[in-house]
């Protein structure tokens, strides 16, 4: 099979899944535009802001994508490109899309609150607090790691820093103008075209005016930006920046697809399936943990139930944003695999070791895009900049999500400190930023990062658990959620067990203990969920009832 044929077949499968399986899932969730969404019910102009579906899709897609659907699939090709593609398609359709949409709808039916609150309402208060501590700790780790990555990227490539600063300025102007445009569709289209054109121009301009600072300064600037992006109205900075940035990824996908069809490069990699890898371990569970965002990722549930659910204008918009957004990401993951299977197995192994996944992705797609007449160096730089731009999106979105998590944890607290943390977004964001700085300064984030893959997929399993219990409690057959849930628990518990034992043998006791704690946490939440189902009979959903 040729590379264009693989891409075409994958696209047809994903589109068909949206139209066919998507329809079944939409009916199971009883998505109804007559239901009032949290963005209208709790509209505050800061976090709850009803927005156009294309804008929310841009925010959501930019937030969940990042480098995840690029790095994970490329590393997973170690086990063979055929199992990688199969899991991307099967996982994206039956696991990831259901997980993302389910998290979004469950949140919208629970005042736009996070998975933690859904756990509290359906499993119990203890379950909520445990989940909140876990998700908050994970978000602080992600903020620290990405602040470090972006600061180093800006040092190594000052042009990316310049372009990123220009993007932020453009986003603020776009967000301000968009407020005055309101519901005038034609004017919105015009400012979108101008905004996207300027953004692509700023890619070029940024490279011409590199902006260089030292690591320490970039670190504090980035976290100051993350603070501002977390407390300002979502429609002023975060949402328009993500919306405009999403067109970088759309452009990347379009140019890459055309380039692959036009170049029709030979697939040099063999079809061998490796059950084990010396560096990674066994295909099960490593493949399913490594591909992550390309098929299913727990981080998506935090975004879907955190920022996105508060911006959905009508429930029907969640179809394309939640279910459709995941399938687009799966297609990007297929493109990532395509970018490296034009290499032989030996060339792939060597490049993965020496260059890393992002450079391999940039070089592979850049060479194919160059066949369209685009200078190869420019094409490679464009791909690399696109990936870097989305790292900044992950940073600011995670800061806002961590703020939501901290506020929800103390929601209903009667003591003065708890009330302040729950009600004051400036104080809660300040704590998030300070904790992130402390983790960076300690250097502990480099020690903890290896466990993120397993922790991320555990988040997915726990989100599916919360969605399943919620559905069962409101008399809905949750089999389509339970099957992915059981599989993801099997994957994550196996992965955590292996990870704990391996690090114990290597005397990396901190990682071993953390893995064991996460293993126990998941068991406790499963037991709490089982007890909650045994203790209370199914009840009809209040407000937005299912048929």
Language-model features: where?
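Membrane-interface "cap" regions at the ends of multi-pass membrane proteins
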Residues: 13-70, 282, 286
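Extracellular loop-to-transmembrane helix junctions
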Residues: 2-19, 76-107, 116, 161-171, ...
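Extracellular/periplasmic helix-exit of transmembrane alpha-helices
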Residues: 260-274, 327-363
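Flexible loop linkers connecting adjacent transmembrane helices
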Residues: 23-49, 75, 85, 89, ...
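Membrane-helix boundary/coupling elements in multi-pass transport proteins
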Residues: 67-74, 91-93, 99, 103, ...
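Transmembrane helix-loop junctions in multi-pass membrane proteins
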Residues: 2, 68-70, 82, 141-158, ...
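Membrane-interface helix-loop-helix modules in multi-pass membrane proteins
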Residues: 49-110, 121-125, 142-156, 320-347, ...
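Loop-to-transmembrane helix boundary motifs in multi-pass membrane proteins
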Residues: 125-140, 324-330, 375-379, 392, ...
């Amino acid at each position: 099979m040729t590379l264009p044929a693989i891409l075409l077949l994958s696209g047809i499968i994903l589109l068909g899944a949206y139209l066919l399986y998507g329809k079944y899932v939409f009916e199971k969730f009883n998505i109804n535009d007559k239901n009032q969404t949290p963005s209208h019910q709790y509209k505050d102009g800061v976090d709850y802001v009803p927005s156009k579906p294309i804008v929310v899709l841009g925010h959501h897609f930019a937030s969940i994508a990042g480098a995840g659907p690029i790095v994970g699939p490329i590393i997973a090709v170690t086990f063979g490109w055929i199992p990688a593609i199969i899991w991307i398609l099967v996982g994206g359709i039956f696991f990831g899309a259901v997980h993302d949409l389910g998290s979004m709808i469950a949140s919208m039916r629970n005042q736009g609150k996070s998975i933690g609150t859904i756990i509290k309402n359906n499993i119990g208060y203890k379950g909520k607090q445990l989940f909140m501590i876990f998700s908050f700790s994970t978000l602080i780790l992600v903020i620290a790691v990405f602040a470090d990555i972006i600061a180093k990227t800006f040092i190594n490539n000052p042009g990316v820093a310049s372009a990123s600063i220009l993007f932020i300025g453009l986003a603020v102007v776009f967000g301000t103008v968009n407020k005055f445009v309101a519901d005038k569709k034609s004017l919105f289209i015009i400012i979108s075209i101008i905004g996207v054109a300027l953004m692509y121009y700023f890619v070029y301009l940024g490279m011409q005016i590199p902006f260089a600072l030292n690591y320490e300064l970039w670190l504090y600037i980035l976290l100051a930006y993350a603070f501002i992006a977390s407390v300002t109205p979502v429609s002023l900075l975060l949402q328009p920046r993500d919306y405009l940035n999403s067109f970088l990824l759309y452009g990347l996908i379009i140019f890459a697809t055309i380039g692959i069809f036009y170049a029709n490069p030979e697939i040099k990699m063999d079809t061998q399936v490796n059950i084990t890898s010396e560096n990674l371990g066994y295909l099960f569970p490593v493949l399913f943990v490594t591909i992550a965002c390309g098929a299913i990722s727990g981080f998506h549930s935090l975004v879907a139930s955190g920022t996105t659910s508060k911006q959905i204008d009508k429930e029907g918009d969640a179809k394309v944003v939640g279910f459709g957004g995941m399938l687009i990401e799966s297609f990007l993951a297929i493109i990532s695999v395509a970018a490296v299977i034009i290499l032989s197995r030996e060339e792939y192994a060597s490049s993965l070791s020496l260059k890393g996944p992002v450079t391999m992705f940039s070089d592979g797609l850049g060479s194919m895009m160059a066949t369209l007449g685009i200078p190869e160096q420019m094409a490679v730089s464009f791909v690399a900049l696109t990936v870097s731009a989305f790292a900044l999106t992950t940073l600011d979105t995670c800061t806002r999500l961590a703020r939501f998590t901290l506020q929800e944890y103390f929601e209903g607290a009667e003591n003065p400190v708890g009330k302040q943390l729950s009600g004051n977004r400036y104080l809660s964001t300040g704590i998030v930023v300070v904790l992130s700085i402390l983790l960076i300064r300690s250097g502990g984030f480099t020690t903890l990062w290896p466990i993120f893959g397993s922790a991320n997929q555990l988040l997915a399993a726990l989100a599916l658990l919360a969605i399943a219990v919620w559905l069962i409690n409101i008399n809905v057959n949750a089999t389509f959620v339970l099957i992915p849930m059981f599989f993801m628990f099997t994957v994550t518990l196996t992965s955590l067990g292996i990870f704990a034992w391996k690090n114990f043998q290597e005397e990396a006791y901190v990682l071993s203990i953390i893995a064991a704690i996460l293993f126990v946490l998941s068991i406790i939440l499963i037991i709490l969920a089982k007890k909650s189902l045994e203790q209370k009979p199914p009840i009809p959903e209040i407000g937005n009832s299912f048929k």
